[in-house]
């Protein structure tokens, strides 16, 4: 990066390729294009300085350009070291938006880039965060706590935490007071995924959330579509691109049966695999059983299954003792947000053979091998290109509406975690119906009165489960 070049991408020469794919994606993202049409003239995000930490894909490029069209200034990094699509990053950088994202970046680079998305050229600060997984939010809040004298940077629990702490210490030394200034300027954060939402609720419970947050993940048009239908298409895509293994007839184990697990099980089942599910929640376990899947304990199938996928958002779901017992050439991957669902750190002292980017063959002392995809990180983005544009349009439309809500009405919110109101959820769904040729039935005034709703909605109570 030169002194005048405010971006870091793999190859700026890929910008034209990226621009062509962005143009195609726009035709598949009716929600975002409708947001541009509705809000483009009024520019409700004028004055917003958005720090974005979310997978730098073609679909995210359409989101970024929608935010810019609505008046925002944006700085962007990926929220995963393997998920960037380099041509997408190049196209956004070439358009003048600062982006710091390279597929296969190191952890040190990842946290450096997270720092850079808060570094505005004029020395100013961000006033909004758009997050996926919570790393950008956590970076600022941990740094501010360290500035306040809390002893929180001394005992890292992992390699990544060690690198994160080092980056925070570097910034503390270079610019004292920087984290506190950043934190105090933030009007709000909108969070994309389950893992990041869990972090926000934990902060709220401890009284450590210093600004309002909108939980985009639990909008129905995100969790029941992106998490389920997105995974249904992208999981098998990632496994196929990574391994070229035929899934028909194979035994696949899906760890977790939440929305992501449901989509993942459907993905593998649709490819012809015989799917088994592990679950800790009796309700989800019963759902899996009644959907036709055998609900098992991992220990009972670990030596016989062919494919293992984690979807839980928890840690140590597949441990070293499980992988040691797997059959030769078992495939192991994760589609939850972070890389600690699989105990990858416990594999580091074994023999690794890199087959190709994001595909590693790991050999145990007894001679059995496993194929590990994306080093235990999101395989659908590491080994493939993530969810299709159409389903991401629904998720990202929620993000745009949430950013507008907090930026324009932030003072009306307490420092708590909120979800978007039902009418906006229904609006996002409505924006995507025409693309699929779907036509809504309309209630008569008498029918609406009979069930106690307005003719144009919302049609369900807040407690309704879709």
UniProtKB/Swiss-Prot annotation:
Major site of localization recorded for this protein: cytoplasm
Superkingdom in the source lineage: Bacteria
GO CC term (a single one): cytosol
Annotated TM spans: none
Single annotated GO MF: adenosylhomocysteinase activity
Keywords: Cytoplasm, Hydrolase, NAD, One-carbon metabolism
Pathway annotation from the record: Amino-acid biosynthesis; L-homocysteine biosynthesis; L-homocysteine from S-adenosyl-L-homocysteine: step 1/1
Catalytic activity from the UniProt record: S-adenosyl-L-homocysteine + H2O = L-homocysteine + adenosine
Signal peptide: none
Keyword NAD (UniProt): yes
PANTHER family given in the database record: ADENOSYLHOMOCYSTEINASE
HAMAP family recorded: AdoHcyase
Function field: May play a key role in the regulation of the intracellular concentration of adenosylhomocysteine.
UniProt protein name: Adenosylhomocysteinase
Gene: ahcY
